Design a protein with these regions (language model features):
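Sec/Tat signal peptide C-region and signal peptidase I cleavage site
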Residues: 18-22
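Core dinuclear metal-dependent hydrolase active-site scaffold
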Residues: 24-73, 115-184, 245-247
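Active-site environment of divalent metal-dependent phosphoester hydrolases
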Residues: 66-68, 84-88, 110-112, 123-126, ...
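A short acidic, amphipathic alpha-helical/loop segment
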Residues: 91-96, 179-182, 203-207, 228-232
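Bacterial N-terminal signal peptides
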Residues: 5-17
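Binuclear metal-ion centers of metallo-dependent hydrolases, dominated by the metallo-beta-lactamase
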Residues: 117-128, 153, 205, 209-247
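Active-site metal-binding motif and surrounding structural segment of the metallo-beta-lactamase
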Residues: 64-111, 184-190
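Proline-aspartate-enriched helix->loop->beta-strand connector
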Residues: 186-191, 195-218
Length: 247
């Protein structure tokens, strides 16, 4: 009898979701209007996001440690910012792929995913009904102990995705680099804010004042207190800082 009970318990555990992982319906979401229907943003966690526009779904940096992807919608488009394990997860990508899913990644991901399109900094393409721009993402200030940047120039991408008339910038792992500060006509921005890999709240505020997104979401912020960023931009009424749970 005890052996049968133990066997039943092992079977239940084998088919149970990994502790801590969440499925659709448990994440925070925002809905923004576009010229052709609403854009729904799902805040998965850390640097991982999902965008839904009509029937089309875009996943950015899907990683299995942030979600149970067997319970999330399949992807029409997957964007990967760089090769680090908290951004690139081939198993999560495989779970989300359909026959016609497009997978786009930065140069540092080449050879790590099958069937991927590599986009260099500065490239643009129309993918799955959206215009996508790959923009630089790198460190200039924060370095490893041997003096090399955590994210070297040219390895990683940020992405600007145009959903009809709404331009959404997902910065990836980067600092407040000149290319970021020169961006124009950004409606929604996701800027990373954790040390030593990306930016301080002061660096994020500096970048936001330069390119002036209408809505700014800090993400990838780890243990950094996002209220500091809210305070820094408190005198910028045209930039709405929205803090969401990112796991």
């Amino acid at each position: 009898m005890q052996r049968a009970a133990l066997l039943l318990l092992l079977i239940l555990l084998a088919f149970s979701p990994t502790p801590g992982l969440r499925a659709q319906g448990t994440f925070q979401q925002d809905t923004l209007p576009t010229g052709s229907g609403d854009l729904t943003i799902t805040f998965i966690g850390h640097g991982t996001l999902m965008f839904s526009h009509g029937e089309t779904v875009v996943h950015v940096d899907p990683v299995s440690r942030e979600a149970d992807y067997t319970h999330l919608p399949d992807a029409d488009l997957i964007l990967v910012t760089h090769e680090h394990g908290d951004h690139l997860d081939p198993e999560a990508i495989a779970l989300l792929q359909k026959d016609d899913t497009r997978v786009v990644a930065s140069p540092s991901c080449e050879g790590r995913i099958e069937g991927v399109r590599i986009m260099e900094n500065g490239e643009e393409a129309d993918l799955s009904g959206f215009h996508v721009e790959a923009v630089p993402a790198y460190n200039r200030v924060h370095m490893r102990s041997e003096g090399t940047p955590y994210h070297p120039q040219g390895n990683g991408n940020g992405y600007i995705i145009t959903f009809e008339d709404l331009r959404v910038y997902v910065a990836g792992d980067t600092e407040n680099i000149p290319e970021m500060k020169a961006l124009q006509d950004i409606d929604v921005a996701f800027l990373p804010m954790n040390l030593p890999y990306t930016m301080t709240p002061e660096m994020v505020a500096d970048a936001a004042r330069a390119f002036r997104p209408r809505i700014l979401y800090p993400y990838h912020f780890g243990d950094t207190d996002p209220s500091r960023l809210v305070d820094l931009l408190g005198n910028e009424p045209e930039i709405e800082v929205r803090v969401r749970e990112m796991g």
